[in-house]
Every structure is written in structure tokens, then in C-alpha cells.
Amino acid sequence: SHAFPFVRIRINLLDSLRGPALVLRLIPQTILTMEQLKLPEVLTELAGRPKGLILVTGPTGSGKSTTLAAMIDWINRNETRHILTIEDPVEFVHDSKRSLIRHREVGMHTLKFHNALRAALREDPDVILVGEIRDQETLSTALEAAQTGHLVFGTLHTNSAVKTVERVLGMFPPEEQDSVRRSLSE
């Protein structure tokens, strides 16, 4: 992504049958609060939890990143926490307020989400945002982080709670799915 004084732009360049193509996604510089977005109060309660795994799911363009940015902003304004974001690319840039926030970009600061998440466990964050949980390694490490006292946020591209659970379990071999199901229910 690239920053300009009034907006950040996520740029994807690609080649196609008819030649090069460009996709631009505008990311506002100002992070809207949960109140401004009129998000349910339960999200504030979840953001205030000391540990756990919070998955924000939905199709492309449904507001997953905006919702997570608002939740991280709430923590930053109301809690004294060490927050680490791992994104590809970094979308919403938070300035530290009551919390210390550090951003890591996949491809620039780390090779993969999994590598950054594994390293994060040694960096003593309280809150970890994983921009997108794409594979079993990343999900396993996110579950481990949540079980060892971190508050972990992540996104998945699914359309319902049932599809989310199916997708999560489907990332694991059948012999591991019962264990993962128990981990998710804790």
C-alpha cells in the first residue's frame, strides 16, 4: 500500500490475457471508531478481553478490515497494551495512544504470516492482529497464541459462522479436528 496526505491506496498490479491491469483500493487515513461505525456493543466487550481468538469473517468488501481497525483503535484509546499487527499489506496505520502499536508487513518485514506470528510469541505482545489467516500453520500458531494468554484477532473469507467453523476445521487433517474443535470452544 502507498500513503498520500489524505488516503492510503492498496495497489494490485496483474497481467491478464488482454494486457496489464491495475486494481486500487482506497483506505481512509482516519480510523472510524466503533461508535461511528455503529458496531454492536459486544465487539467492545470482546476487544476488552485479556486473551482469546476473535475471528472477523465475511466476503471481500464486507468491512472486516474496517471493523478490526476500529476494535484495535478502541484498545489503543482505552487500554495499556502492546499491540502487534501483521498484515499484507499494512492497511490502517495506528499511532500509539495508551497502547504501544507496532506494524509488520508480510513481504517487507517478514516472509509469511506464520513466521511473523511465531516471532511475535517471543516479542511479548498482549494483542496480535493477523490480517488474514490463510493456512493451517498460521491458524495453529494463532490458536497457540490465544491459549498462551494473548488476544488474537484475525480474518477469514467466509459467509457465516457455520462456514467459518467448517473452514477452520478443514485446514486440519481429520485426526486433528477434534482437538481443534475443543480449542475453539474454550
Language model segments and positions:
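Short, flexible helix-loop junctions that flank or precede catalytic/ligand sites
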Residues: 1-186
